[in-house]
Curated annotation (Swiss-Prot):
Cellular component annotations (GO), alphabetically ordered: extracellular space
Gene that encodes it: Lgi2
Signal peptide location: 1-25
Domain called LRRCT: residue spans: 140-190
Chief localisation class: secreted
Compartments (UniProt record): Secreted
Record-given protein name: Leucine-rich repeat LGI family member 2
Length: 550
């Protein structure tokens, strides 16, 4: 910041003018985003910070502090940010949470305190959180003795949704959930006088973290993801396709109103620009290969959606067909599939009166083939082969995911069932491991899910904490199976499948601002992983194998 060092009448004039500015305006002008943070008008994300940013609150609704070095959460530590609705405190160094630590946060709904080095949580640490709906304490293991009684009672009384609190001891409670403990009445009563020291101990909760296995995984990886290339623009979706032995990538860029097509450069060993399809608020670019023809469905929020075809004489994509605006108002996803050697695609419509529609190729063009349910604001569509039968799974903001089955007689999709107890699912993706069908279901806040088909229904395999997730994408490179879980509030997580435990384990954290899609691309015996970013730069990671013998 430059300081005024001049004197005279001009200096006095500037000083007088400054005094006329309201104090709040002066503070707002001086406010800066700390070097360790990333700030927008509504959110702050800090990595490795030693303090809570003292930024003028404005409309700040979410604050994320990750890998911080501060040692305690003091009383009223966040009271200068009264508009907070989400507070994420993950993988920090603090050991103590004091009484009234979150005082002043009357609108806080989501509080995540996972994977820290907590030793003590004061009895009144959560006092004043009247609007709290979600609390997550995972990554901490509790000694479920008398010192945990206050938390046990609080869990019984709170209306908030609280993650499972697992007990590490004593032996009779080991691996049990704290809220499933019968009672502390017998263990925590005495006929003798209770000393002040005993009372103080009863107000504290001792935790111990068991990170040995996790540290081992990170110290001895067999593979890794490293940044290969950074693209200087925002994006919301990435699709890949092959044509004539070359690999291409289509990237939707709504802010630049482009569908950028990249090709792999075999000489420079990176992805370079090949063509650019312009439009209005493009949210999706989906490639369709039919015989020797290459089409790209370009979904737009305004001006209708269109289909482009690659013209070899012009060596570029040219408009081939319009998609009527009356059917698709707010496209949110495009899914390509084949049934009986015929090519279809579906556009999920997320508008209030949306009408998700299936389109079919008829050798001359694509025409609307079947309109699915309306008024459900569909956010995603996934084509799935279940026991040899074709199905569509539609996720929606207004109901649980529904399953439609292809009727061979009518050659239309008909309702077949749903996935119960899975409200607010944004996206559904299918994948297979060892011939077993799995689904990944994305939730923005709460828990995303991995589910498995057991020949009768989909059953839960694993819950993954979601912190502002818009995508949970499965992908594989050779025998390595991964899940990428995006986050708008902290690091995105890459999970790797553990064959022995039959679950996904945390493998690596990557930082991508507001990730919207993850896409695997392989070429020249190299494997890449595109991470689109709605608010920052699009990143391309390379999957590498680490030789531990070196």
């Amino acid at each position: 910041m430059a300081l005024w060092r001049g004197g005279g009448a001009l200096g006095l004039l500037l000083l007088s003018a400054a005094c006329l500015i309201p104090p709040s305006a002066q503070v707002r002008r001086l406010a800066r985003c700390p070097a360790t943070c990333s700030c927008t008008k509504e959110s702050i994300i800090c990595v490795g910070s030693s303090w809570v940013p003292r930024i003028v609150p404005g409309d700040i609704s979410s604050l994320s502090l990750v890998n911080g070095t501060f040692l305690e959460i003091k009383d009223r530590m966040f009271s200068h940010l009264p508009s907070l609705q989400l507070l994420l405190l993950n993988s920090n160094s603090f050991t103590v949470i004091r009484d009234d630590a979150f005082a002043g946060l009357f609108h806080l709904e989501y509080l995540f305190i996972e994977g820290n080095k907590i030793e003590t949580i004061s009895r009144n640490a959560f006092r004043g959180l009247r609007d709290l709906t979600h609390l997550d304490l995972r990554g901490n293991k509790f000694e479920c003795d008398c010192k945990a009684k206050w938390l046990y009672l609080w869990l019984k009384m709170t209306n908030s949704t609280v993650s499972d609190v697992l007990c590490i001891g004593p032996p009779e409670y080991q691996e049990k959930k704290l809220n499933e403990v019968t009672s502390f009445d017998y263990e925590c009563t005495t006929t003798g006088p209770q000393t002040d020291e005993a009372k103080q101990r009863g107000w504290q909760l001792e935790l111990s973290l068991g990170f040995c296995e996790l540290i081992f995984v990170f110290q001895h990886p067999l593979s890794d993801f490293v940044v290969h290339q950074t693209l200087p623009y925002q994006s919301v979706s990435v699709d890949t396709f092959n044509s004539k032995n070359d690999v291409y990538v289509a990237i939707a860029q709504p802010s630049m109103e482009n569908c950028m097509v990249l090709e792999w450069d075999h000489i420079e060993m990176n992805f370079r620009s090949y063509d650019n399809i312009t439009g209005q608020s493009i949210v999706g670019c989906k490639a369709i290969l039919i015989d020797d023809q290459v089409f790209v469905v370009v979904a737009q929020l305004f001006g209708g959606s269109h289909i482009y075809k690659y013209d070899e004489s012009w060596t570029k994509f040219v408009k081939f067909q319009d998609i009527e605006v009356s059917r698709i108002s707010k496209p949110n996803d495009i899914e390509l599939f084949e049934i009986d050697d015929e090519t279809f695609f579906i556009i999920a419509d997320s508008s209030k009166a949306g009408l998700s529609t299936v389109y079919k190729w008829n050798s001359k063009g694509f025409y609307s083939y079947q309109s699915l349910h309306e008024w459900f604001r569909d956010t995603d569509a996934e084509f799935v082969d279940i026991d040899g039968k074709s199905h569509l799974i539609l996720s929606s903001r207004s109901q649980v995911p529904i399953i439609l089955q292809w009727n061979k007689s009518s050659k239309k999709f008909v309702p077949h069932g749903d996935i119960p107890n899975m409200e607010d699912v944004l996206a559904v993706k299918s994948f297979r491991m060892q011939n077993t069908l799995y689904l990944s279901l994305t939730r923005f806040i709460g828990d995303s899910r991995v589910m498995r088909w057991n020949s009768k229904q989909f059953v839960e395999v694993q819950a993954l904490p979601s912190r502002g997730a818009m995508t949970l994408q499965p992908f594989s490179f050779k025998d390595n199976h991964y899940l990428a879980l995006g986050s708008d509030y902290t690091f995105s997580q890459i999970y790797q499948w553990d064959k022995e435990k039959q679950q996904f384990k945390k493998f690596k954290e990557i930082y991508v601002q507001a990730p919207r899609s993850f896409t695997a691309v392989s070429t020249d015996r190299r494997d890449f992983f595109f991470a689109s970013s709605f608010k920052g730069k699009t990143k391309i990671f390379e999957h590498i194998i680490v030789d531990l013998s070196l």
